[in-house]
C-alpha cells in the first residue's frame, strides 16, 4: 500500500476532501509504521490490519494464496494516565474505531480513532478493502478486486442503497474450492460471493440476513 500524501486524501465532496487535506497537514506522519506520540499521529496501515487481519485460503494445485485486506488509516495519540482517567469519563469506545485503552506497565494510554471526514467517510482514497490472488512462485499479484459495495453504508450513517464499488474493509478470510471458485462473505454489504479463482471475476452473489 502506497504511503498516504496530502494529494491522496479523499472525500465524497470537495468540501470534506479539503477538510481531510487540512487535517493531514496538521497530523504527525513519518510514513509507514509511524510510532505513537503525544501529538495526534497518522498510522497507515492502521492497527485494524493490512493484509494480516483476516485469514487466507490456498490453492495447492496452482499455488495461489487468496488474501483480503483492510486499507483504513487511523489517528492516535499517547495520553498520560491522568488524562486517560479524565477522558474515559466522557468518551467511550465506538464501532467506528474510536478507542481509549491503557498501556500495561507504562505511564501512558492510547487514544485512537478512524481517520474520517465530518461526513463519516474515510479520508483515504478507495479501495478501503480488496481481495487478491497471489502467485506464490512469482510472488506477484495475479488479480485484485474491490471487496464489496457501499449498499449498506453512506455519509452521516445513512444507507445509500447504491451498488457503488469502493471496496470495503474486510473482516474474515475466504474459502477456496478445487472447482476454481473463491467464496467470500465478510464484506459490509451482506452478500456471499463467488469469484473465479483464475480471473477474480464475480460470478455469483447471494444476499445474507447479516454481515
Where are these regions (language model features)?
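Beta-sheet-rich non-transmembrane sensory/scaffold domains
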Residues: 1-211
Amino acid at each position: 500500500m502506497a504511503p498516504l500524501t496530502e494529494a491522496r486524501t479523499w472525500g465524497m465532496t470537495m468540501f470534506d476532501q479539503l477538510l481531510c487535506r487540512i487535517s493531514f497537514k496538521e497530523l504527525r506522519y513519518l510514513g509507514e509504521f509511524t510510532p505513537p506520540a503525544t501529538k495526534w499521529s497518522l498510522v497507515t496501515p492502521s492497527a485494524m490490519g493490512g493484509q494480516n487481519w483476516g485469514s487466507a485460503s490456498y490453492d495447492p494445485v496452482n499455488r495461489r494464496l487468496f488474501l483480503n485486506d483492510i486499507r483504513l488509516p487511523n489517528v492516535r495519540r499517547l495520553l498520560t494516565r491522568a488524562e486517560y482517567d479524565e477522558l474515559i469519563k466522557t468518551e467511550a469506545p465506538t464501532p467506528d474505531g474510536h478507542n481509549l485503552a491503557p498501556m500495561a506497565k507504562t505511564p501512558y494510554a492510547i487514544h485512537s480513532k478512524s481517520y474520517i471526514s465530518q461526513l463519516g467517510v474515510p479520508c483515504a482514497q478507495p479501495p478501503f478493502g480488496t481481495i487478491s490472488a497471489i502467485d506464490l512462485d512469482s510472488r506477484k499479484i495475479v488479480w485484485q478486486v474491490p471487496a464489496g459495495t457501499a449498499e449498506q453504508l453512506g455519509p452521516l450513517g445513512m444507507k445509500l442503497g447504491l451498488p457503488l464499488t469502493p471496496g470495503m474493509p474486510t473482516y474474515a478470510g475466504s474459502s477456496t474450492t478445487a472447482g476454481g471458485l473463491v467464496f467470500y462473505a465478510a464484506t459490509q454489504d451482506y452478500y456471499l460471493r463467488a469469484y473465479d479463482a483464475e480471473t477474480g471475476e464475480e460470478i455469483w452473489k447471494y444476499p445474507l440476513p447479516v454481515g
